């Protein structure tokens, strides 16, 4: 993992994807596409084959970052009633489609429901940074597991016009 100021989410997602990909390769299994999709979810600049096919030259068409998902909450633990205790990182609401990201399995998609504050009062949304709350998760999650939301896909059109690379975003 290279670069500066990589978040815990970035390091965890990349390490998890690489670990599973390496385990598959060593076992002689084909690469599960879920792990390639996983590294596309984190904030990143465009990927390349590097020097795999020889000297690549410089890629200067785009230095913008892309992200396929944002972290909404971090799992702190499990309450006595079995609900997950979480800390908010980005606002989300009941009914939002989320993913539980652990280090042991591919992400699990679920719908946010039954959010509760520290007093057990029902919440429709968790709008405050670092707000502690509880909610049921689709499976057991260890502390520091993440809950994330997929972001709308951005379309990037890169083409050659008059000998120069042109890029447009929608």
Each predicted region: which residue ranges?
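Extended, alpha-helix-rich binding/interface surfaces that flank or overlap catalytic cores
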Residues: 1
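Surface-exposed amphipathic alpha-helical tracts and adjacent flexible/coil segments at the periphery
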Residues: 4-170
């Amino acid at each position: 993992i290279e670069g500066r100021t990589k978040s815990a989410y970035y390091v965890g997602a990349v390490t998890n994807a690489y670990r599973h990909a390496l385990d598959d390769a060593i076992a002689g299994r084909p690469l599960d596409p879920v792990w390639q999709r996983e590294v596309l979810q984190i904030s990143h600049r465009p990927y390349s084959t590097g020097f795999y096919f020889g000297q690549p030259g410089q890629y200067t068409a785009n230095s913008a970052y892309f992200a396929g998902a944002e972290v909404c909450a971090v799992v702190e633990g499990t309450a006595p009633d079995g609900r997950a205790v979480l800390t908010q990182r980005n606002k989300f609401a009941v009914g939002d489609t989320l993913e539980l990201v652990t280090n042991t399995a591919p992400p699990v998609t679920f719908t946010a429901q039954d959010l509760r504050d520290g007093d057990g009062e029902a919440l429709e949304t968790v709008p405050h940074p670092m707000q502690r709350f509880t909610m049921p998760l689709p499976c057991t999650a260890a502390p520091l597991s993440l809950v994330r939301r997929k972001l709308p896909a951005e379309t990037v059109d890169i083409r050659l016009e008059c000998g120069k690379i042109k890029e447009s975003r929608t």
